[in-house]
């Protein structure tokens, strides 16, 4: 299973095409729209979220609420397009209009300058329109489809915010996936710790007042995962590696860790490895989950626990120093409409990309042509691993 996305931030809209879904899987537009709505929420979002009310148009691959086994095409309209029709026109426009909203002062930390160098664009708008996090709209749409597939197989995905601007949630226990879903949805910053959430919101407000931005850390937990997804036999078959790649592919994300993550470097092996248990009711389990649900690049039946770190958004309302590519003189960088903090929304994007990789791994391991046989094979596998 794979997908491609297309579209610019201020173009007519964004498109994704998914290939490889099994036939007969239940899927409605509402399954996607509820995830799009979640992405648009969160304390710290900018003015654009008051303009865009994202709704998906499914244009291919579904009939009467079920997948056909053919490619699924989805489109999300950009409501703000009407204000950008000339600037972002597909057809040629007069030269004076062509230079309208031209960007010649790249923003530090963004794709602007290097993208312009790479593709020969003397207007960095050609770069920023595609590199914008607006593209994550259709990544969330694709992830919503993956989450639906996993849900039907008894696999659930939840994300939450661990840290914003140096304020970290004080979590003294593990949370079940359902509990994470319910608690994070009730928080304006998707944080499980109400006290920390208040401090996070204050830091976001302070950053906005100062024309600045702040980043943070999100965590995604996947429960009900069968053992044996991914493989140890080749480096590029390891599922944790694929998930790590997916996490750092999200705009502004700079790292990923599983389980205790980098803390493992500071502990002896006896405090890191998860002891193996067995019972007739549950089969093989682990006493702890320090490795985040992975051993040898494969799922071990414990919940997947992965975290991603997001840098502050590079668009600042008090811009940093840059250089004009025409005159080579020093100026302040260009300013584009942006958020002061998008960490809560990014947790939804992280859910989507993790769900996608897990769904792909499921389809790689089990028959993916028909959804009814897929469900049967997953259940048979659960029983086999329990009896091993």
From Swiss-Prot:
UniProt entry tagged with the keyword Lyase: yes
Pathway(s) this gene product operates in, as recorded in its UniProt entry: Metabolic intermediate biosynthesis; chorismate biosynthesis; chorismate from D-erythrose 4-phosphate and phosphoenolpyruvate: step 7/7
Regions crossing the membrane: none
Cofactor: FMNH2
GO biological process: amino acid biosynthetic process; aromatic amino acid family biosynthetic process; chorismate biosynthetic process
Family: Belongs to the chorismate synthase family.
Subunit structure: Homotetramer.
Function of the protein: This reaction introduces a second double bond into the aromatic ring system.
Protein name from the UniProt record: Chorismate synthase
Taxonomy of the source species: Bacteria, Bacillati, Bacillota, Bacilli, Bacillales
């Amino acid at each position: 299973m794979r997908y491609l996305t297309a579209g610019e931030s201020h173009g007519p809209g964004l498109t994704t095409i998914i290939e490889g879904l099994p036939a007969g899987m239940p899927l409605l537009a509402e399954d996607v729209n509820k995830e799009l709505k979640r992405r648009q929420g969160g304390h710290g979002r900018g003015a654009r979220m008051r303009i865009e009310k994202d709704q998906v148009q499914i244009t291919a691959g579904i009939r009467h609420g079920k997948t056909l086994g053919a490619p699924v095409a989805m489109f999300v309209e950009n409501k703000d397009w009407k204000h950008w029709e000339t600037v972002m026109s597909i057809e040629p426009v007069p030269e004076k209009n062509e230079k309208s909203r031209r960007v010649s002062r790249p923003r530090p930390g963004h794709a602007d300058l290097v993208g312009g160098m790479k593709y020969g664009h003397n207007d960095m708008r050609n770069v920023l329109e595609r590199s914008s996090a607006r593209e994550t709209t259709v990544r969330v749409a694709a992830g919503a489809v993956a989450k639906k597939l996993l849900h039907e197989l008894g696999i659930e995905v939840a994300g939450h915010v661990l840290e914003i601007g140096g304020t970290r949630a004080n979590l003294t226990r593990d949370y079940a996936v359902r509990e994470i879903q319910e608690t994070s949805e009730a928080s304006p910053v998707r944080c499980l710790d109400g006290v920390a959430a208040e401090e996070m919101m204050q830091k976001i407000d302070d950053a906005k007042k100062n024309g600045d931005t702040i980043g943070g850390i999100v965590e995604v937990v996947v429960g009900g995962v069968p053992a044996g997804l991914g493989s140890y036999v080749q480096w590029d078959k390891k599922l944790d590696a694929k998930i790590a790649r997916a996490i750092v592919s999200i705009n502004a994300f700079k790292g990923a860790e599983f389980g205790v993550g980098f803390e493992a470097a500071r502990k002896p092996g006896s405090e890191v490895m998860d002891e193996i248990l067995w019972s007739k009711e549950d089969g093989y389990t682990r006493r702890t989950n320090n490795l985040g649900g992975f051993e040898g690049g494969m799922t071990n039946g414990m919940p997947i626990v992965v975290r991603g770190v997001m840098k502050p958004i590079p668009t600042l309302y008090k811009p940093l120093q840059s250089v004009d590519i025409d005159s080579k003189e020093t100026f302040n960088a260009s300013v584009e409409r942006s958020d002061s903090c998008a960490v809560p929304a990014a947790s939804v994007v992280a859910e989507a990309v993790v769900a996608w990789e897990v769904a792909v791994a499921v389809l790689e391991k089990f028959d993916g042509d028909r959804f009814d046989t897929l469900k049967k094979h997953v259940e048979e596998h659960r029983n086999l691993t329990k009896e091993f």
